[in-house]
Amino acid sequence: MANFKLMDQNGNNAGEVTLNDNVFSVEPNEAVVFDAIIRQRAGKRQGTSKVKNRSAVRGGGKKPWRQKGTGRARQGSIRAPQWRGGGVVFGPTPRSYAYSMPRKQRRLAIKSVLSQKLLDQNLVVLDKLTMDAPKTRDFVAILNGLKLEGKVLVVSDDKNVQLSAKNLPKVKVVPVNGLNVEDAVNYDKLVLTQDDVKKIEEVLA
């Protein structure tokens, strides 16, 4: 167990929080993180591309000319793949690109990213993060008070916080159960609350 600096949302020191070594101090595994991101991106693919094979193309039921005696190559349908306007051979059909990954590897991936954020000093833990109303200006003031620069990923279940960050291109807010490997890697800073840390540790520790 390691003690980590705890801050309030105004950027002031609010004491310390204990981080579980099994979650925030594991040896980062880049290969597993890479596999997790590829899996996550594969699951987002639509997989709706489709072309027609010779049975799906309209027409072509009649043999274009008789089998023998014309001197031309034998043909059975004008919708065969060698014809212009014919069907496509082995073309794409609707499919799901999603695939599974062992639970231990999925958990190791997110733990690796969290540990790397801690190593790189890109992790910020707040005692709480709340807003009375969705105000982008107030949320920007919070980020400035915390001296956060670059792309910032904020973990919060507060609806006002989520709405306040919608217009900020370099800020993304996700609920604690929506924290994922790809977002954590793509954003420079990760902001968690004390309660979020406990919830994450309950699942991953």
Curated annotation (Swiss-Prot):
<keyword id="KW-0687">Ribonucleoprotein</keyword>
<dbReference type="Pfam" id="PF00573">
    <property type="entry name" value="Ribosomal_L4"/>
</dbReference>
<dbReference type="GO" id="GO:0006412">
    <property type="term" value="P:translation"/>
</dbReference>
<keyword id="KW-0689">Ribosomal protein</keyword>
<comment type="similarity">
    <text>Belongs to the universal ribosomal protein uL4 family.</text>
</comment>
<feature type="compositionally biased region" description="Basic residues">
    <location>
        <begin position="51"/>
        <end position="71"/>
    </location>
</feature>
<comment type="function">
    <text>One of the primary rRNA binding proteins, this protein initially binds near the 5'-end of the 23S rRNA. It is important during the early stages of 50S assembly. It makes multiple contacts with different domains of the 23S rRNA in the assembled 50S subunit and ribosome.</text>
</comment>
<dbReference type="GO" id="GO:0019843">
    <property type="term" value="F:rRNA binding"/>
</dbReference>
<feature type="region of interest" description="Disordered">
    <location>
        <begin position="44"/>
        <end position="77"/>
    </location>
</feature>
<comment type="function">
    <text>Forms part of the polypeptide exit tunnel.</text>
</comment>
<dbReference type="GO" id="GO:0003735">
    <property type="term" value="F:structural constituent of ribosome"/>
</dbReference>
<dbReference type="InterPro" id="IPR013005">
    <property type="entry name" value="Ribosomal_uL4-like"/>
</dbReference>
<dbReference type="InterPro" id="IPR023574">
    <property type="entry name" value="Ribosomal_uL4_dom_sf"/>
</dbReference>
<keyword id="KW-0694">RNA-binding</keyword>
<protein>
    <recommendedName>
        <fullName>Large ribosomal subunit protein uL4</fullName>
    </recommendedName>
</protein>
<dbReference type="InterPro" id="IPR002136">
    <property type="entry name" value="Ribosomal_uL4"/>
</dbReference>
<dbReference type="GO" id="GO:0005840">
    <property type="term" value="C:ribosome"/>
</dbReference>
<comment type="subunit">
    <text>Part of the 50S ribosomal subunit.</text>
</comment>
<keyword id="KW-0699">rRNA-binding</keyword>
<dbReference type="GO" id="GO:1990904">
    <property type="term" value="C:ribonucleoprotein complex"/>
</dbReference>
